[in-house]
Amino acid sequence: MNNNKHIFAIRWGIVCCGIATALTASVALTACSDDDLGPSIYDTREYPLDRSVYTFPLDTFVKKNFLEPYNLKFIYKMEDVGSDMQKNLVPATYEKSVDLAVLVKYLWLDVYAKLAGEKEVFLKKYSPRIIHVIGSPGYLSDGSREVGVAEGGVKVTLMEVNRLNVGQIEGAYGLNQLFFHTMHHEFGHILDQTTLRPTAFNTISTGLYDAMGWASKSDTIQAALGFVTPYGSSQAGEDWVETLACYVTYNDDRWTQLLNSAHYDWEEIDYAEEDYKANYPRAYQEYVGGYNRMTCNYDTIGYLRQTANYEFKLVRKVVPRNADGWVALDADGNYELSTNADNIDGREVILQKLDLVRGWLKENWAIDIDELRQEVQGRQYVTDDEGHFVRDRFGNFVNRLTYVDPANPDQPTIFERLTQEVEEYKKLQTTK
């Protein structure tokens, strides 16, 4: 096995849409190894758990739900030998480790066990052998935050666990961005190493991949070229698993915004730092229903961003402009957005790639990616009797994990029931 690592990092950017700004994050990763899965290289002897230690409930839970059914270790007591000694890392707290363990089981393991053709056997064959959790992020030399590392399809390290907030599914610090996009992405690599993706996928975006410069690229400009994320534009293998992971974890609003943005042509120009700083506070000036909300999304005419190199850029849709740079309106006061000027409709390219992922999962693993997406998001968001996602009064999807049913307000939430599974093992504890 080689030592190639797959590093997930967050590079921060500030974006401005008209008069509003928002904080966005793009996933940054380095190359993955193509190691084959083989026999266990770890000590597989069983050791009895110490019932007198404080961590006995979680130790028992992960043994019963990770190790025994799937030969998967969930290591939350941070191991220096398994961590990057060049970084000042902090262990995950016991409480946050409990939260992540029950969520990984509920939102990842249980989903694949339910939908894969071989059920539980599928995960025992193909899941990573180790999930290692760390409380803090690691910081890279370019200032980005490392939130995950994957090694050879065997070990996945999830960082920043002490920031876990079950009440936040979306966003830069949401469950999906920090943890579950990583899990689906890396699992996609393992499956791709087992049964290679269709060769037709590798030719769709030939000539557009940039292994060295992808990190400085704008999300929307890359979307217009047919990539779901800038990292997906680094190489075909990453494009493949990013397409899979984004489709599964993006809710309907975010996926629709991505496709809408991808349909248009975009341009990026340098922007003065002083203008950038002057516009930044305006994100917080719109109030809806008494709540402070940022209104920016990718489906707008333009936004500001700060690159990983601390350069300031204006990213905007291509429209006719006058000599002063203002949008040129026609006689009726309208303007026309440019599409397919480069003969690429990013929306159609993304959907073409998704169709190949869909067929590959179905043919090789008997997994319907649309059912997978519905199952994952149906566990994250409240649905009505017809399976439609429910929105709150602000138009946001309702978090199912923390939802309190008005008809049964005294009943525990789903997340409370999940953590109670761990608490049940306290009954088996002893004291010295």
Q: Where are these predicted regions, by residue range?
A:
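N-terminal secretory signal peptides that target proteins for export/translocation
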Residues: M1-R11
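Acidic/polar, low-complexity intrinsically disordered N-terminal segments immediately downstream
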Residues: N4-H6, C32-G117, V121-K124, T339-K432
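Sec-dependent N-terminal signal peptides
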Residues: A9-T24
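C-terminal motif of bacterial Sec signal peptides marking the signal peptidase cleavage site
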Residues: V27-A31
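Second-shell loop/turn segments in exported
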Residues: Q86-Y94, R163-G174, L178, G226-S234, ...
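Auxiliary, metal-adjacent structural segments of Zn-dependent hydrolase domains
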Residues: V98-V156
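Active-site recognition of the HExxH zinc-binding catalytic motif
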Residues: E170-P198, V241
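Metalloprotease/metallohydrolase-associated module, dominated by Zn2+-dependent proteases
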Residues: Y209-K432
